[in-house]
Structure formats: structure tokens, C-alpha cells
Amino acid sequence: MNGWAGVCLITHCLNTRSRTYVALNMLAFARTPRGVPSCLFNKVWVSRYALVLILMVCASESSTSWAVTSNGLPNCSTVTRTAGQDAELHGPAPLSCNVTQWGRYENGSTPVLWCTLRGSRMRVSLGHRVAFGCSWKTFFIYNVSESSGGTYYQKGYNCTDKHITLSCFNLTVVPRAVQSTTTVMTPTLVTNSTFSVSLVALRLTTNSSAFGHAIYQRQQRVENGTLSKNITNLAFTYGSWGVAMLLFAAVMVLVDLGLPQSAWRRWRSHVDDEERGLLM
């Protein structure tokens, strides 16, 4: 059993298309040998539970372990934004891809995954301290700063035209113009023949404190909305796998204890008794 299950587990880790098929193969070959008592906590069942748990954990992980390096990248598109603006990176990956990933190259060559889309589900990596969003064709970065600049990539897997598609974007963030303030001393004549001097501040800028406060509130709303959406997606993904593992474990326990077989035998015995009663 352990040999077949190990082969199936290795096949699962190498195969990124169909995990359900591998799970069925493992369950088909993982049977209790003859002469071994069917017990919930014997060595065979303990090893079986361990392999199934490993399989579930591997299945919950998407194909994010595929290495992406900056070597051999296509010609990257250049995107320039001023600090404080929003940036949109439009990728050419078609909707025919089963999986789409967005990320950024750190330190020039190390890929860091930010977002993964698989079907109707989205998985977002937290901790980047950047308000962003992603879709199948567009990656959004809100209120960019100088630290937001760099090389971003989009990768599609299992596409109809080719197995893997890759595109990259060089985001350049230009700092804002330096705001200057000029103070002019102007005399003011009062009607009671007294002379006083007042300061008149002439600000050579169009930005006001109210406008800056509105931008800050908008940024906070975007970050809070993105964070709540990411938490909801993570809770749904891991909650679904938790429910599936509990149901699967319950079915395995019932089968191992022989409850379905016992219920079937009792029902057949009851039917046979009724048939014999009718014949008599």
C-alpha cells in the first residue's frame, strides 16, 4: 500500500492539472492487506491518513512553486506614473488560461507572487503594504509611491495556445514636483492713522489640506476594502478544504468500522424474512 501511495503522491506533486485523479488513484490502490485486522488505529490506517493529509495540503497549494526567473523575459512594457496616481498593468494573457498569476521581481531576479486567479477563485498574498487588486487581464496599484516601482510579471498556465504565457512590465514612478511657498511682507494702512505690518502668505500650489485629506480617506477605503476581500477569499478557500477533509475522514471511519456493510446486511436480512413470510 505504501509503495503505491508514495508513487501516486509523487505523481500528484509533479502534476499540476488534475489532483482529483491522483487522489482517486491513491484511494483505489490503498487497501488493507489480507490478514491485517481492520482497525482504525493500526499502522496501515495511520500511514493512509498521513498520506491523505499530505495530499490535501498539496492540493490546497496552487501551482505557485513553478520557478519564474528574470532570465529570458520578453520585452517588458514600460509604464510611467507620478507618485500618488493609480497604475494599471494590462496583460495580454488570454482568458483561455486556467491559472493566471501576478507578481513582482524583488532584488532584480527573485519572483514574489502577489495574486493567483484560478477559475472564480482568487488568492492574494498579504504583507506587501501596497493597495492593489488583480483580475485576469489587469493588475491595479493604487496611490503609487517611489517604492512601488520595479518589474512586475503576469504568468498564465495551461492555456489553449501554449502551456505557459509570460509578460512583464517596468513600472517607473516619478516624484511629485516640489511645492514652494513665498512669504511677502506688505504694509497695511488703517483709518485711525496707525501703521501696521501684516504677513500675507502666497502659496504657489493648487493642493489644499482638504484635498489631501480626501486623498488619504480614499486610500484608506481602498486598502480596507482590499484587505477584507483578501481575508474573505482566504477563509473561503481554507474553510472549503477543511470541510472536505472532515467529510472524507468521516466516510473513511464509517467504512473502516463496517457500518455501511452492517446496515446493508441487516436490510437484506429483513427483506429476506419478509419474503419467506409471504411464501409461507
From Swiss-Prot:
Record-annotated membrane-spanning stretches: 235-255
Membrane topology: Single-pass membrane protein
Keywords in alphabetical order: Glycoprotein, Host membrane, Membrane, Transmembrane, Transmembrane helix
Cellular location(s): Host membrane
Cellular component terms per the entry's GO annotation: host cell membrane; membrane
Domain of life: Viruses
Record carries keyword Mitochondrion: no
Residues annotated as glycosylated: 75, 98, 107, 143, 158, 170, 192, 207, 224, 230
Family to which this protein belongs: Belongs to the RL11 family.
Record's protein name: Uncharacterized protein UL6
Species this chain originates from: Human cytomegalovirus (strain Merlin) (HHV-5)
